[in-house]
Every structure is written in C-alpha cells, then in structure tokens.
Amino acid sequence: DALGAPREDENQFLEDVIFGYGKMHEPGAVLDFQMDTGLNVIECGFFAYDDWLGASPDGLTSDGGVLEIKAPWSRRKGQEREFKSLADQPQYYAQVQIEMLCAGRQKAHFYQYSSHAQLHEVVPLDQAWIDENIPRLRQFHAEFLDIIASPDMAADYLAPKRVIIDTPEAHKMMVEYDELTQ
C-alpha cells in the first residue's frame, strides 16, 4: 500500500486530497471562466428541489445558466492528455442535469480547468433525462430512508467512521499537494 495504510484508508486519503485540490483551484477557474466567456458568475448556495433532492452548483452565470467546475488532479502537472468530454463522464452529466433542475435553469456551463488548459461545454437541460431518472432517484431516496430508519438494516449499509492516516508516505503526498496549491 503506497501510503503505508490499509487499502480502503489509502483510497479515502487519495479522494480527500483530490477533492481538496479541486476546491483549492475553483476560485482561479471561476476567474478564468469569466475572462474566457465574458459572463459574470454569482456565488450561490444549495438549491432544494421538493423536500428530498438538492444541488449546489459552483455558481450561477449571467446568461441564466449554472456553472460546474472540475479541476482534475490528473492534470495538475500539465500532462498533455486532453480533458474527457462530458459525454464520457456520465456522473457529471447527471450532476449538471440535477443542478439545472434544482436551480430552475435551462443550461449549464461545464468547465474543466487546469493552469495549462481548459475545456468549456454548454449543456442544455435534458427533460427526457429528468423524466427518466428523477422517479428512480425518488424511489432510491425513499428506500434509503426506510433503511436508515432500521438500526439493523442501517448497520449493513452505513460506512464506519474513517481512520486517520498518519504515515510518512501520506505526509509526502501532502507536501506535494501543498506545493501544487501555492
């Protein structure tokens, strides 16, 4: 195990570092997006849909859209590999569709950013996707509420508290992360 910890803890550590990297670069990406497009971005919070679903886009755009930014860890050193299109990342397609639904917007700006390159895709609200998937999500939500209401069932599905990784390998990775974010 590269970080000197059990595999599941190592994966969680990597996920935390990767997520932190993206959040750290979000303000610069917003500024870059505004310069590239001429659009203004307004910070926003959480948008609730009915009483069971919600989303928090990275901003609202002056043309009536939502903004979703991704700053991939894999592009941190300027590798030449191109960004994946949104069509090749269905999890993010779902994310922007739900953001538009919750925020009451008809389009999304999906902006992938690194200090070396950017990819901007404009995505319309896909009503067919909404009509097909929102009922499924509503059913999943109802089933989840049933599970967590039962302590016996919940124990099988809810994750245990995370373990803190404190190894030399983990510290080296954090030093690299700190250097990249300065």
Which role does the model predict for each range below?
Residues 1-182:
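Accessory terminal regions of nucleic-acid processing enzymes
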